[in-house]
């Protein structure tokens, strides 16, 4: 974590992570590591990446266009509900957006290891010298290592995209929340996770997830 935090050692640290991935194999190699096109587009970038894992091409602009949210995304960003609506529209009803609040790390681990899907999360991102007043962020968890006490995150933010980040599980869990402005009310999402799966796959229901399309 300290190596990533320090701008002087960050590039070396990222090269070491990349080397490790080449040796052991990166998780979900079929999934595109997407860079968000603006500071507002972390949600659309995550949807683009999750669809890429399924072999479906969508764009971040297409996500925003499907919601007619060009002004909204710059003002308050996109909610999980918005991402679900975009998934339904761009997937033409062939894919389902499942979500679960108040999740556990074990839920993420089960989805990755048993069901073999990457997991979207809504959390308080860590940007270091790029920090701004709103740290609400979307990323994709690609690996959970209980023994090592860390997880790997595909982060679309420009400084971290391309190589999955490595964060301590405890550190991530403390930041696994976000707030959203919905109809004038501020609502807090706690430990929100989500996946995009083909229509007809109902295993997310076994984990207490709900369809959000």
Roles of regions detected by a PLM:
Residues 56, 92-93, 117, 209:
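Short aromatic/hydrophobic-glycine micro-motifs
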Residues 1-77, 146-147, 199, 203-213:
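Active-site-adjacent structural segments surrounding the nucleophilic cysteine of cysteine proteases
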Residues 78, 87-100:
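Mid-length scaffold segments of soluble, non-membrane domains
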Residues 43-46, 79-86, 104-108:
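Stable alpha-helical elements in mature extracytoplasmic
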Residues 101-158:
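Active-site-adjacent substructure of cysteine-protease-like catalytic cores
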């Amino acid at each position: 974590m300290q190596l990533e935090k320090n701008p002087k050692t960050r590039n070396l640290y990222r090269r070491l992570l990349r080397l490790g991935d080449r040796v052991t194999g990166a998780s979900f190699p079929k999934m595109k590591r997407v860079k968000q096109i603006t500071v507002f587009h972390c949600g659309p970038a995550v949807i683009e990446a999750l669809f890429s894992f399924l072999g479906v091409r969508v764009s971040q602009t297409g996500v925003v266009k499907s919601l007619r949210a060009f002004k909204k995304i710059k003002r308050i960003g996109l909610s999980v509900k918005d991402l679900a609506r975009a998934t339904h529209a761009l997937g033409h009803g062939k894919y389902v957006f499942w979500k679960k609040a108040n999740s556990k790390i074990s839920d993420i681990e089960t989805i990755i290891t048993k069901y073999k899907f990457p997991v979207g999360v809504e959390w308080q991102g860590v940007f270091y010298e790029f920090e701004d007043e709103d740290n609400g962020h979307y990323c994709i968890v690609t690996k959970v290592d209980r023994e090592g006490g860390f997880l790997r995150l595909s982060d679309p933010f420009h400084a971290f995209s391309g190589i999955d980040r490595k964060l301590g599980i405890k550190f991530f869990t403390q930041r696994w929340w976000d707030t959203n402005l919905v109809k004038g009310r501020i609502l807090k999402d706690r430990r929100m996770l989500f996946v995009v799966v083909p229509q007809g796959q109902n295993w997310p229901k076994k984990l207490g997830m709900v369809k959000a399309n």
